[in-house]
């Protein structure tokens, strides 16, 4: 398959590299790392095995990438409104779009722009960061929870097959709203406490009794909000 990766940071770069390693034609939209990846390729350090993609298809604009079978958009949620102009040049008649992003209200925007039939949501449960330009450090986990915007089982099976071909653990969520709240149960407590604590890591939070209790209380609050939201949407998943 041809795959365009928009927002090729640590997350998009890692999963795109996995798919490229599996033999797919993956093209990356890079900004900061463009020159380094063109010159030295993309290197991944991972508990699943280190690897180096010596020749990587990279571009500085989505127009250079062109239409693809799949678009993986892994922008930050704060950049959601810029996604349309970045993704549009990569969309052909049969292109599917995977919004590999955190937060709520992601898929409705993509559905509005491109049509719900081609849109998927994806939530990455992974510990990962970028090192020097063109280097990605995968530390732990790696599962992606996916769901089609119209809950089409056949579409979900197609995306699941694509991701698993790249040795990516993939789970089809009961529904997208459930999956997004599930991810927020982690993001809201730990991202918030990390920033409030001056950039402290997860292990520091878990190792401090007071911070751990704060994280647990925040998680319980997110669960309550999520379940209330799912009830209002008449979702059977809790």
Spans of model-derived segments:
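NAD(P)+-binding Rossmann beta1-loop-alpha1 motif at the extreme N-terminus of oxidoreductases
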Residues: 1-50
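Nucleotide donor/acceptor-binding cores
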Residues: 1-2, 69, 142
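Hydrophobic anchor at the start of a short beta-strand
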Residues: 3, 25-27, 97, 119, ...
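Active-site-adjacent beta-strand anchor residues
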Residues: 5, 27-30, 73-74, 99-100, ...
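Residues at the C-termini of beta-strands that transition into short coil/loop
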Residues: 30, 48, 60-62, 101, ...
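Short alpha-helical
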Residues: 32-36, 78-79, 104-105, 154, ...
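Rossmann-like NAD(P)(H) cofactor-binding subdomain of soluble oxidoreductases
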Residues: 52-135
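Internal alpha-helical scaffold of NAD(P)-dependent oxidoreductase catalytic cores
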Residues: 89-90, 109-118, 133-236
């Amino acid at each position: 398959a041809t795959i365009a990766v928009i927002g090729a940071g640590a997350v998009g770069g890692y999963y795109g590299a996995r798919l490229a390693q599996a033999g797919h034609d993956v093209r990356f939209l890079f900004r900061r790392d463009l020159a380094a990846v063109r010159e030295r390729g993309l290197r991944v350090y991972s508990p699943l095995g280190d690897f180096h993609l010596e020749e990587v298809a990279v571009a500085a604009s989505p127009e250079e990438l062109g239409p693809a079978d799949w678009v993986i958009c892994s922008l930050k949620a704060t950049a959601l409104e810029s996604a349309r102009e970045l993704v549009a040049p990569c969309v052909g008649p049969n292109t599917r779009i995977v919004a590999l992003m955190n937060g709520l209200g992601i898929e409705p925007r993509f559905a509005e722009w491109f049509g719900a039939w081609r849109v998927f949501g994806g939530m990455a449960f992974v510990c990962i960061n970028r090192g020097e330009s063109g280097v990605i450090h995968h530390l732990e986990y790696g599962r992606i929870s996916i769901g089609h915007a119209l809950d089409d089982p056949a579409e979900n099976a197609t995306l699941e097959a694509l991701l698993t071909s790249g040795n990516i653990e993939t789970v089809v969520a009961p529904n997208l709203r459930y999956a997004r709240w599930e991810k927020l149960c982690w993001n809201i407590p730990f991202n918030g406490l990390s920033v409030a604590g001056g950039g402290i890591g997860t292990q520091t939070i878990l190792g401090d009794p007071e911070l751990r209790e704060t994280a647990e209380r925040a998680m319980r609050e997110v669960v309550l909000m999520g379940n209330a939201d799912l009830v209002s949407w008449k979702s059977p998943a809790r």
